Amino acid sequence: MKRMVSWSFHKLKTMKHLLLLLLCVFLVKSQGVNDNEEGFFSARGHRPLDKKREEAPSLRPAPPPISGGGYRARPAKAAATQKKVERKAPDAGGCLHADPDLGVLCPTGCQLQEALLQQERPIRNSVDELNNNVEAVSQTSSSSFQYMYLLKDLWQKRQKQVKDNENVVNEYSSELEKHQLYIDETVNSNIPTNLRVLRSILENLRSKIQKLESDVSAQMEYCRTPCTVSCNIPVVSGKECEEIIRKGGETSEMYLIQPDSSVKPYRVYCDMNTENGGWTVIQNRQDGSVDFGRKWDPYKQGFGNVATNTDGKNYCGLPGEYWLGNDKISQLTRMGPTELLIEMEDWKGDKVKAHYGGFTVQNEANKYQISVNKYRGTAGNALMDGASQLMGENRTMTIHNGMFFSTYDRDNDGWLTSDPRKQCSKEDGGGWWYNRCHAANPNGRYYWGGQYTWDMAKHGTDDGVVWMNWKGSWYSMRKMSMKIRPFFPQQ
């Protein structure tokens, strides 16, 4: 391609030089004719036409030739016997011919002028035509020259693109070779090994699943009947734990209480050590062994394990995870002035508490409405003031005082919406006196380790065992308990 373009370019250049040489020859010849006209022709000769300044003359219509009679008949020639008259060449002519009969050798100026004029017209036309042809050829040559330069530039660009494409192809080829080598060395050789490992893991998991299924079946069989506490219960009893301590029950363990003679006695855990004792534990969280995400009736009646004897003693000296029951809590708090103590512990062992001098829970007809007052403590007044991290109406939405009790099947919270999915108890993991929604959530889901995130939560909400005024929304307590006792002046 490059050789062909170079040969065509050389050929056009040679043709251009030949045409320019031919034009110069005709111009010189034409100039010589004009010079002779100026030196020898009379005023009757034509004037050269300046095409740039003058218009070409137009031919006028010629009149018809004159008709009619002409000369009379020529006289008869003289006889041959007559004496030949010698003709003498006129002076106007040039040199004489060697034979006198042939006359003048050179023509006169008028004859030469006329002959030249007869030849000048076709030559002039030819010269004009050649000039036009030369100009057209020159323009064509210039266009061809420019086109050839354009082709040359395009060809050079194409050559560069081809070279760049070759480099890209080489790079991709090298990359493909590397990938092919990697596949051959790693994937093809490792896949069989990985498959064997996965088969081994699968078999191991299958055996573990079978063992778990066996354990679950045994546990389900064991839990077909309600769990019973196999430990001794003290003989001393009373209306609540405060009356028991006054009767001499001084150890913290499980007791039987009977607030009213119309109800059967029931088990509670009495804390006889904290702040002079006499506390009836109505709620306790410590290890996540009991699910607090329950319906209205279980919260009404109570659930969980009141106490355990895992310390090796013959009595239940340690509290379990349980909720005493809303009916029982309501009855105990409506017997007289009652105080509430909420204790909590984080996963580092740090402890805080919130004490309320007044605490009352209404009956079921009033949806177990809560009332608290007279706060003191180190945990922060979450029940009365709401979450300290929030401001304005957002904080007001987290106040629990005065709220009704809610479970996921009985929506009594302060989140007023037509969407049944937007329910605090359903999103926050337990039954509680929710507003919209909480600053405290003692009955929430139990998270090991304390810190948890929204993607760990079932609904993406802060549904842990939370007390926002101490640890914020995304920290679930290790332990939390709620204890009540009749209010009396301390000595």
From Swiss-Prot:
Coiled coil: 157-222
PTM field: Conversion of fibrinogen to fibrin is triggered by thrombin, which cleaves fibrinopeptides A and B from alpha and beta chains, and thus exposes the N-terminal polymerization sites responsible for the formation of the soft clot. The soft clot is converted into the hard clot by factor XIIIA which catalyzes the epsilon-(gamma-glutamyl)lysine cross-linking between gamma chains (stronger) and between alpha chains (weaker) of different monomers.
Annotated S-S bridges: C231-C316, C241-C270, C424-C437
Biological process per Gene Ontology, one example term: cellular response to leptin stimulus
GO MF annotations in UniProt: extracellular matrix structural constituent; protein-folding chaperone binding; signaling receptor binding; structural molecule activity
Effect of A98T: In DYSFIBRIN; fibrinogen Naples and Milano-2; defective thrombin binding resulting in decreased release of fibrinopeptide B
Domain Fibrinogen C-terminal: 232-488
Signal peptide: 1-30
InterPro entries referenced in this protein's UniProt entry, alphabetically: FIB_ANG-like, Fibrinogen-like_C, Fibrinogen_a/b/g_C_1, Fibrinogen_a/b/g_C_dom, Fibrinogen_a/b/g_coil_dom, Fibrinogen_CS
Region named Disordered: 44-75
Database matches in PROSITE patterns: FIBRINOGEN_C_1 (PS00514), FIBRINOGEN_C_2 (PS51406)
Annotated Basic and acidic residues bias: 47-57
Main location: secreted
Expressing tissues: Detected in blood plasma (at protein level).
Highest taxon of the lineage: Eukaryota
Record's keyword annotation contains tRNA-binding: no
Region (Beta-chain polymerization, binding distal domain of another fibrin): 45-47
Record Gene3D superfamilies: 1.20.5.50, Gamma Fibrinogen, chain A, domain 1
Keyword Glycoprotein tagged: yes
Linked pathology: Congenital afibrinogenemia: Rare autosomal recessive disorder is characterized by bleeding that varies from mild to severe and by complete absence or extremely low levels of plasma and platelet fibrinogen.
Subunit structure, interactors included: Heterohexamer; disulfide linked. Contains 2 sets of 3 non-identical chains (alpha, beta and gamma). The 2 heterotrimers are in head to head conformation with the N-termini in a small central domain.
Domain notes: A long coiled coil structure formed by 3 polypeptide chains connects the central nodule to the C-terminal domains (distal nodules). The long C-terminal ends of the alpha chains fold back, contributing a fourth strand to the coiled coil structure.
UniProt name for this protein: Fibrinogen beta chain
Source organism of this protein record: Homo sapiens (Human)
